[in-house]
Amino acid sequence: MDPGPPPPAAPPQAQGPPSAPPPPGQAPPSAPGPPAPPGSQAAPQAPPAGHQIVHVRGDSETDLEALFNAVMNPKTANVPQTVPMRLRKLPDSFFKPPEPKAHSRQASTDAGTAGALTPQHVRAHSSPASLQLGAVSPGTLTPTGVSSGPAAAPSAQHLRQSSFEIPDDVPLPAGWEMAKTSSGQRYFLNHIDQTTTWQDPRKAMLSQMSVTAPTSPPVQQSMMTSASGPLPDGWEQAMTQDGEIYYINHKNKTTSWLDPRLDPRFAMNQRISQSAPVKQPPPLAPQSPPGVLGGGGSSQQQQMRLQQLQMEKERLRLKQQELLRQVRPQAMRNISPSTANSPKCQELALRSQLPTLEQDGGTPNPVPSPGMSQELRTMTTSGSDPFLNSGTYHSRDESTDSGLSMSSYSVPRTPDDFLNSVDEMDTGDTINQSTLPSQQNRFPDYLEAIPGTNVDLGTLEGDGMNIEGEELMPSLQEALSSDILNDMESVLAATKLDKESFLTWL
């Protein structure tokens, strides 16, 4: 169905005279244009459905270059004109700097603009130890500090005068005045320099007095005591016409206003001449520790200390030799006469003598004298190194990190009863201790001094160590005797019955 032709458009409205003028203060009407459609109330015309408004701007690269040029070359850049400061809506105080106020109490307030009056907390002025007790006698000592009278404040408020302040009744220096701010803090006015400060000028005075006061009496006393003695040799005291005293040195043909008795060089020479001559100590041995023999003692004391150290060293050397003699015969118990002269036994004996020869300077150990003191014999029967168990400095403590069990000490894996039974099982000929050869069948003795080595080297170096390879094979094929089996059963039975045993059998 054809809707028909559209209705004719309304004729354009003729322009007539403007309406009544707008009231004052209202913006003038804009340029004449087509009237807004009815009901739109001059709202911006929305784009049709499905259309978007695209704002086309210039090249962004050129805009960035312009910004960089404005910064790098401010003279050649086209800086946009800004609104002058006079045309901006700024208060009048912006263009009028504050006038400097007179020096008065009203000018020193916390609300002022003076930046030089910031509180300064100096560490040296805040320590109560630097304050003399006599200066704060009028005040009272409180837990928060020194305060008195109106300066006292509640403990909850930490004011400046509660740290380290001088009471108000102590007079100020000339030209100074103390005032308080609205918050109660004290400051000081210097009328001489026309300045204000937070620092109390009385603190500097007290610190100067405390530094100069104690030093002056000793100096005067030392000068009086030193000047009261006789003049050095070659010096003479004389007096001028005005009554001034001067000193003549006849040795150098010179005069001086300074008393030679006050010169520390002459005083030192005088003391040295009056004191008794001291002998120079002999040169110390290289092995002597410098910390023990040094220290400014007399030569006699140093010689006594040196002799004591030498005696101690000799005594320790004798202990070690006695220990070696006590332990070495035990290694010869299980050596048969047939194997004592074997090359292997001689080699072990030579190796055991090497450390001893090095310690004694290449000479073998001498035979112990029968008149050796009982003290050395009792101290050398312990069976360990004297440097490890002597005194409380170093001792072989009980081990708490043993891997065998949870006990506080460790024991060897081989029980002692079994070792004793092995000694009884020796079927060889009985060896007389007096007829033993001089060869030693031991490892070097310094292995026994190592802590934690509880292995009996003498047992390991018995007949089994000296048997050659050809003799070892037939011995393994022999049947075990009944005596060995009986001994093993007795040892195992004793171990099972012993509840306190900490052996771990793997």
Curated annotation (Swiss-Prot):
Keywords: Activator, Cell junction, Cytoplasm, Nucleus, Phosphoprotein, Repeat, Repressor, Tight junction, Transcription, Transcription regulation, Ubl conjugation. Coiled coil: none annotated. The modification Phosphoserine is found at residues 60, 104, 108, 126-127, 130, 137, 163, 273, 288, 369, 373, 384, 390, 399, 402, 405. GO terms for cellular component: bicellular tight junction; cytoplasm; cytosol; female germ cell nucleus; mitochondrion; nucleoplasm; nucleus; plasma membrane. Residues 1-38, 279-289 have a biased composition (Pro residues). This is Transcriptional coactivator YAP1. The keyword Signal does not apply. It comes from Canis lupus familiaris (Dog). Belongs to the YAP1 family. Residues 39-50, 147-156 have a biased composition (Low complexity). The first coiled-coil region mediates most of the interaction with TEAD transcription factors.
